[in-house]
Amino acid sequence: MAVSVTPIRDTKWLTLEVCREFQRGTCSRPDTECKFAHPSKSCQVENGRVIACFDSLKGRCSRENCKYLHPPPHLKTQLEINGRNNLIQQKNMAMLAQQMQLANAMMPGAPLQPVPMFSVAPSLATNASAAFNPYLGPVSPGLVPAEILPTAPMLVAGNPGVPVPAAAAAAAQKLMRTDRLEVCREYQRGNCNRGENDCRFAHPADSAMIDTNDNTVTVCMDYIKGRCSREKCKYFHPPAHLQAKIKAAQYQVNQAAAAQAAATAAAMGIPQAVLPPLPKRPALEKTNGATAVFNTGIFQYQQALANMQLQQHTAFLPPVPMVHGATPATVSAATTSATSVPFAATATANQIPIISAEHLTSHKYVTQM
């Protein structure tokens, strides 16, 4: 059965959130500095979001009053990254379809069924340990053989009967974002007596960097690696002691992810050699809901399950020699000599007995399974 993935025109990666302060007319930042969109009157805004003009990204929009947003340079860079992530997702979907087609060719009795997008398990929202496991991320739409899916398409990590405190889940969620630092509240009030190089919290020079939802700033990872060349970077450049803190947090997250992946593989009976290395964190994690972040872990996990299923369905069929013109005495002697070998005792018991030509002529054919 041929498998095809119908290309769907997805505009989610072109979607940007509109600045609420701009809608009220109170935004003090221009459109070239604000991290949210400042659409013109001709743009269509739906539910506080606007779609960017694809032709504008290519520099070929000739419409006089375009109903799509023509983003400024910093938002254009963000959309280009979103577009690359979207292309990677489509490429991996095509590769998965080819793999499932090959698996179906090897197992003709395994029909392929489309799998809709769903959350892996409700307990993952409150399971702090499972938050670091890339193999238990949200499942993207794909094609999976029906028999390797459970009755209810859901994977449960850990013990769902044991509740995890909300504080632990919140701490796990905070540790996932190792590229963020909490802003010093005393510094915001102007009362911090510790310097920028001594305080354990961030002292951003520009208040536009601060995310008002959780009072944090996003760290410039290029600056951490010593390669930020932007003249006016919109991300926070931390001092040396905070850089060490970020690197330590990243190391802890990687170690926790590796330990959780190994524990999950051992619990499910998957050999460690089957699981590929842990995927890297996505390039950007934005809070505007526009990024179509692709998680490759689920495809690696599904491929491991498919390999296990192929191994289970592969049965060993021993060759059945046919001896023509042999007498019953010869056959019994051959059987006796074979069973005298220690390791051949179990093999001869499972094989189909040797049938002579005289037996075929004097008896009917009997099919032995």
From Swiss-Prot:
Belongs to the muscleblind family. GO terms for biological process: mRNA processing; regulation of RNA splicing; RNA splicing. Keywords: Cytoplasm, Metal-binding, mRNA processing, mRNA splicing, Nucleus, Repeat, RNA-binding, Zinc, Zinc-finger. A zinc finger (C3H1-type) spans 13-41, 47-73, 178-206, 214-240. It is found in: Nucleus; Cytoplasm; Cytoplasmic granule. GO terms for cellular component: cytoplasm; nucleoplasm. This is Muscleblind-like protein 1. GO terms for molecular function: RNA binding; zinc ion binding. The lineage of its organism: Eukaryota, Metazoa, Chordata, Craniata, Vertebrata. InterPro entries: Znf-CCCH_Muscleblind-like (IPR054429), Znf_CCCH (IPR000571). Its main location: nucleus. Involved in pre-mRNA alternative splicing regulation. Binds to CUG triplet repeat in RNA. The gene is MBNL1.
